[in-house]
């Protein structure tokens, strides 16, 4: 199939997608907001007054959904390398969270508040070649897990998107040593042919609990 025909097929599918239509109607930045909505309703990990950090947040669909669910209580801090247009009730920090200066700025923003939930919907720009895309995805996932190790408070939660493939099973095993409950989710808004799955770690273990597990 030619590149133009493939692009036309994608565009047709995209604009006929009910979740795309719903996002447009409700003012959501992306259809990904409804993937998160389903997980939040099923697993009930969100409570009022939580502090939530959204990694790789642009264009902001997940941050919007968190703010919608929490109302005007709690804090949502969105973090991304690329610029994100402002959203009401969302604090945005632009930069690479591997950068010490960015992490220092985040600490200033947090003002000592513990983090209840870290989200990561990050994914690499896809080349279409699994041999390249999967390692890149797993690298981002490792960075997000390291970030959550440092920032999520004991008892807190971590939700991340993975591509099912090489390294994903081992990654899930690592999470089982860090959280009391680990669940794999494939929301209805996630296209069936997509390799993406969402992994939820709930009830972060303390260092003593990790040592004993």
From Swiss-Prot:
Compartment list: Cytoplasm
Reactions catalysed, as given in the entry: uridine(2552) in 23S rRNA + S-adenosyl-L-methionine = 2'-O-methyluridine(2552) in 23S rRNA + S-adenosyl-L-homocysteine + H(+)
Top enzyme category: transferase
GO molecular function (one): rRNA (uridine-2'-O-)-methyltransferase activity
UniProt: S-adenosyl-L-methionine binding residues: 60, 62, 80, 96, 121
Record-level GO cellular component terms: cytoplasm
Domain of life, per lineage: Bacteria
Keywords attached to this entry: Cytoplasm, Methyltransferase, rRNA processing, S-adenosyl-L-methionine, Transferase
EC number, as in UniProt: 2.1.1.166
Main location: cytoplasm
Catalytic residues of the enzyme: 161
UniProt-listed InterPro entries: RNA_methyltr_RlmE, RNA_MeTrfase_FtsJ_dom, rRNA-MeTfrase_E, SAM-dependent_MTases_sf
Main function: Specifically methylates the uridine in position 2552 of 23S rRNA at the 2'-O position of the ribose in the fully assembled 50S ribosomal subunit.
PANTHER family reported for this sequence: RIBOSOMAL RNA METHYLTRANSFERASE, RRNA METHYLTRANSFERASE 2, MITOCHONDRIAL
Protein family according to the UniProt entry: Belongs to the class I-like SAM-binding methyltransferase superfamily. RNA methyltransferase RlmE family.
Protein name stated in the entry: Ribosomal RNA large subunit methyltransferase E
Native source organism of the sequence: Xylella fastidiosa (strain M12)
This protein's encoding gene: rlmE
């Amino acid at each position: 199939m030619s590149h133009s025909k493939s692009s036309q097929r994608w565009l047709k599918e995209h604009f006929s997608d009910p979740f795309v239509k719903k996002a447009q109607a409700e003012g959501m930045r992306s259809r990904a907001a409804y993937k998160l909505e389903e997980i939040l309703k099923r697993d009930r990990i969100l409570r009022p007054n939580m502090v939530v950090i959204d990694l790789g947040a642009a264009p902001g669909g997940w941050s919007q959904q968190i703010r919608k669910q929490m109302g005007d209580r709690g804090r949502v801090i969105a973090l991304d390398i690329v610029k994100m247009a402002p959203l009401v009730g969302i604090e945005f920090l632009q930069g690479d969270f591997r950068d010490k200066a960015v992490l220092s700025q985040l600490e200033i923003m947090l003002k000592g508040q513990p983090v209840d939930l870290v989200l990561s919907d990050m994914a690499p720009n896809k080349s279409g070649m699994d041999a390249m895309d999967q390692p890149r995805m797993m690298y981002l996932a490792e960075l997000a897990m390291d970030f959550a190790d440092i920032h999520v408070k004991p008892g807190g939660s971590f939700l991340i998107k993975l591509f099912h493939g090489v390294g994903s099973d081992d990654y899930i095993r690592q999470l089982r040593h860090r959280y009391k409950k680990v669940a794999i989710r494939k929301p209805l808004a996630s296209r069936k042919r997509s390799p993406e799955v969402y992994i939820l770690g709930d009830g972060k273990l303390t260092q003593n609990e990790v040592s004993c597990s």
